[in-house]
Amino acid sequence: MSQGEIVQVIGLVVDVKFSIGKDLPDINNALKVIKSDDDSIILEVILEQGDGVLRCIAMESTDGLRRGMKVEDTGSSISVPVGPDTLGRVFNVLGQPIDGGPEFPADHPRSGIHKEAPKYDELTTSREILETGIKVIDLLEPYLRGGKVGLFGGAGVGKTTIIQELIHNIAQEHNGISVFTGVGERTREGNDLYFEMKASGVLDKTAMVFGQMNEPPGARMRVALTGLTIAEYFRDVEGQDVLLFIDNIFRFTQAGSEVSALLGRIPSAVGYQPTLATEMGQLQERITSTKKGSITSIQAVYVPADDYTDPAPATTFAYLDATTNLERSLVEQGIYPAVDPLESTSSALDPEIVGQEHYDVATRVQHILQRYRELQNIISVLGMDELSDEEKLIVARARRIQFFLSQNFFVAEVFTSVPGSYVPIKETIKGFKMILDGHLDDLPEDAFRGVGPIEDVLKKALKMGVTPSDPEAKALLEK
């Protein structure tokens, strides 16, 4: 392997000079700086400066680096452990365990984090729904198996909570493998997630990779690729259907922006890196389904200042099959998950994919909620008394639908002391159809809040002293 030496250190940017005439390390190669016998730092080659000088980004703190230190070319990009042994473990960007468990032996299978996306003839085009057990998602923005989903929302509206619930439901109900990638988020959240998953018994079905907000931008920029590489092994070698969670894809863009500034590139719109679309494409094009297996990706997207036209979320939109938009006004009303049923979308909400009944119920729900939103302006100015009887009925049913879209989560049990619920798609459709058809008009609104299937509404109403008068509702209660 060729050797060079450090000629300049500017924060996290390190310039390394190699002898002219010898083979220079390739772009994206990992270089190793040996600080002492038991301490080294990994750099990644970003660009060539000329005269044998390569500009690199450090994956760790550059404390202690100085000019003249020897640097070795590893001959490949950053390589991380792959395979079934990664399940139940926690890694950093370099694939090193950070959970206090045993190190992986030198001969353990590894894979480089930089790869080409699958070729067109390797891709599959089947369109199948992935049941999540979350009513608002399954009804109005169903997720495709092997698709890409964006969870959009500002700070503190529940993106990470939905991701945790999805991991729980997929592991418990589908026995599926998940890879969780924490990109630039709070270390506390990662710590909580690890222990919650351990307690709920789903950790042994999950590999976790973290590059948190206290780490250098180089690590935060590459950690998503580390998680993706682990997921690709399960798809390509073991032929599995994998869920890849990225929390948060905005921090991936943000880290790229920091690296771009450190490299001295001229910024683009709103101060983002000029290579924003390219970097996003290199990541997203690898997240796909092949004839061997699938990767279903669920990505939390922080929206700066709730501005959806910001280049970071706007660039992400282009790659998504479904969007789940979280709305702060619903949080203020105490409706969880705070998913906006009218702004959230899915390309899978098509009668040929979900079936005619599902499609009809979903569009009727959207129509009645849209009409309610229009009537709210009249109500806020003139009050309910100015509405016609038909409009009052629309408002009453819309409010019941809005509350019935809320649901208790398994992962929130420790905070709420209320058991979570998993609702199959068939039960979800049945419940909303009964509300739309007027079978539950005589039940109080509060009975619909924070429940699972429609049977829970009837039981809750009974506890409140209200017995349904509708024959269909009575028959369901007797069952």
From Swiss-Prot:
The keyword Nucleotide-binding applies. ATP binds at G153, G154, A155, G156, V157, G158, K159, T160. It catalyses: ATP + H2O + 4 H(+)(in) = ADP + phosphate + 5 H(+)(out). SUPFAM superfamilies: C-terminal domain of alpha and beta subunits of F1 ATP synthase, N-terminal domain of alpha and beta subunits of F1 ATP synthase, P-loop containing nucleoside triphosphate hydrolases. It is an enzyme of class 7 (translocase). Its EC number is 7.1.2.2. It is a peripheral membrane protein. It holds the Pfam family ATP-synt_ab_N. The keyword Translocase applies. GO terms for molecular function: ATP binding; ATP hydrolysis activity; proton-transporting ATP synthase activity, rotational mechanism. SMART domains: AAA. GO terms for cellular component: plasma membrane; proton-transporting ATP synthase complex. Transmembrane segments: none annotated. It is found in: Cell membrane. Keywords: ATP synthesis, ATP-binding, Cell membrane, CF(1), Hydrogen ion transport, Ion transport, Membrane, Nucleotide-binding, Translocase, Transport. F-type ATPases have 2 components, CF(1) - the catalytic core - and CF(0) - the membrane proton channel. CF(1) has five subunits: alpha(3), beta(3), gamma(1), delta(1), epsilon(1). CF(0) has three main subunits: a(1), b(2) and c(9-12). The alpha and beta chains form an alternating ring which encloses part of the gamma chain. CF(1) is attached to CF(0) by a central stalk formed by the gamma and epsilon chains, while a peripheral stalk is formed by the delta and b chains. Produces ATP from ADP in the presence of a proton gradient across the membrane. The catalytic sites are hosted primarily by the beta subunits. Belongs to the ATPase alpha/beta chains family. This is ATP synthase subunit beta. The lineage of its organism: Bacteria, Bacillati, Bacillota, Bacilli, Lactobacillales. The gene is atpD.
